A protein has these predicted regions:
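Intrinsically disordered, low-complexity non-transmembrane regions of multi-pass membrane transporters
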Residues: 1-16, 22, 176-205, 239-245, ...
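Hydrophobic transmembrane alpha-helices of multi-pass solute/ion transporters
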Residues: 2-16, 37-38, 50-78, 233-259, ...
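Structural signature of hydrophobic alpha-helical transmembrane segments
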Residues: 12-24, 68-83, 129-137, 164, ...
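Alpha-helical membrane segments and immediately flanking helix-loop junctions
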Residues: 71-76, 85-90, 104-115, 119, ...
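Entry/N-cap segments of selected transmembrane alpha helices
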Residues: 93-117, 268-295, 346, 350
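Membrane-embedded hairpin module used as a gating/binding unit in multi-pass transport
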Residues: 165-239
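Transmembrane helical segments that form the transport core of multi-pass membrane transport proteins
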Residues: 210-295
Length: 371
């Protein structure tokens, strides 16, 4: 009786297994370790890590049920948009509406997008890929995935890994830059919080107004901003509590799980282990640093023009990583003076950064698509 076919079937997985697959499985294990042990952005790094392992044992996004998930949620941009609905339902824009000048910091915090775009072009990346890499500077995973899936789907895996990894490393990357760019005297500046009252009507009208205004200015950003704002409208209307809680919990959690698995499933050894991936990861770090530096410099400028009434630390909050960046700036201020509370100011800048990242990503998508 010839059992060679049985032996061939039993060893099929081993014969197609390469050293590259082993390395990528190790990468997946590292991502899972960072999620479990260090608790770095665990809701995303854990499924991305497991998806990476799956991709290198024959369950990539090219075949089987992972292809169904990838096609349904990544190619259609559904998962990033569902996540934005959940994020919008979590965000309180009242600190920003009470301090409209914080919008300036949200704009300054997007400098890394365009600075990294230019750097990627200098390194030889075509415009569509350079733009996708630049959007890592939004420090906003859903925006990076949304733009990347349209402009450079082949680079989606390293772009997503870079965006979420650096977002989780905010407490490690930002503090040295913040201390280097500001003096102790600046970090000790106390900011009075005497906000103008924000009415319920304003909170309800705001998401509607922003959706219309941004969609007219940057039509390609319309899906992102509409998803973010419908989530916020659920929160602020106070009449659909079940939908608001569902957006904040079940919807965003399920979308995040499947998005992480789908992105991880694209991390096959043959497409991930190359110099280009290392360059993307390096450029992503540069984008993050440029965002922080630009925000701090603008914060220092606002400090000068306000007569020393604005703590420059809040400039580092003008990125999309909500609420981590805001909390970090507040903690840095309290390390110098335990009674220095700048949290609400920092949150105002942080929510401005969330809006700024969506608008900047949409404008970039529109400009590149038009060329």
């Amino acid at each position: 009786m010839d059992l060679s076919f049985l032996l061939e079937e039993l060893t099929r997985g081993f014969t197609s297994f390469t050293w590259g697959n082993a390395v990528m499985i190790l990468v997946g294990v590292v991502l899972i370790t960072l999620a479990v042990v260090k608790e770095y952005e665990p809701v995303l790094l854990l499924p991305i890590g497991f998806g990476c392992i799956m991709a290198n044992i024959g369950m990539s996004a090219d075949t089987g049920f992972m292809k169904v998930i990838y096609d349904a949620g990544i190619k259609t941009e559904l998962f990033p948009l569902l996540i934005f609905v959940g994020v919008g339902a979590m965000i309180d824009f009242s600190p920003l509406l009470a301090q409209p000048k914080m919008v300036l910091l949200g704009a300054a915090g997007q400098f890394g997008i365009y600075g990294t775009l230019l750097l990627a072009l200098l390194l030889g990346f075509p415009l569509n890929e350079a733009a996708s890499i630049g959007v890592i500077g939004a420090i906003d995973g859903p925006t990076a995935i949304f733009v990347g899936s349209k402009l450079a789907p082949d680079l989606l895996a390293p772009i997503a890994v870079a965006a979420y990894s650096y977002m989780s490393l905010i407490p490690i990357i930002q503090p040295p830059i913040m201390k280097l760019m500001t003096t102790r005297k600046e970090r000790l500046i106390r900011m009075e919080y005497t906000p103008r009252p924000v009415s319920r009507l304003t909170l309800v009208v705001f998401p509607i107004f922003v959706t219309v205004a941004v969609s007219l200015v940057a039509p390609d950003a319309a899906p992102l901003i509409a998803s973010l704002m419908v989530g916020n409208l659920l929160r602020e209307s106070l009449v659909v509590d079940r939908l608001s809680k569902a957006a904040q919990n079940e919807i965003i959690n399920i979308a995040t799980l499947f998005l992480g698995l789908a992105i991880g499933a694209t991390m096959k050894a043959e497409s991930f282990l190359n110099l280009q991936t290392l360059m993307i990861l390096g450029l992503g770090l540069i984008a993050f640093i440029l965002d922080t530096v630009a925000g701090l410099l603008f914060g220092k400028l606002m400090c000068v023009f306000s007569g020393g009434k604005i703590n420059p630390l809040i400039g580092a909050c003008g990125i999309s990583a909500f609420p981590m960046a805001g909390r970090l700036a507040a903690r840095m201020a309290q390390e110098e003076d335990f009674e220095n509370f700048i949290l609400m100011h920092a949150m105002g800048a942080n929510t401005a950064g969330q809006l700024g990242s969506v608008i900047a990503g949409g404008l970039l998508l529109a400009l590149v698509s038009a060329l």
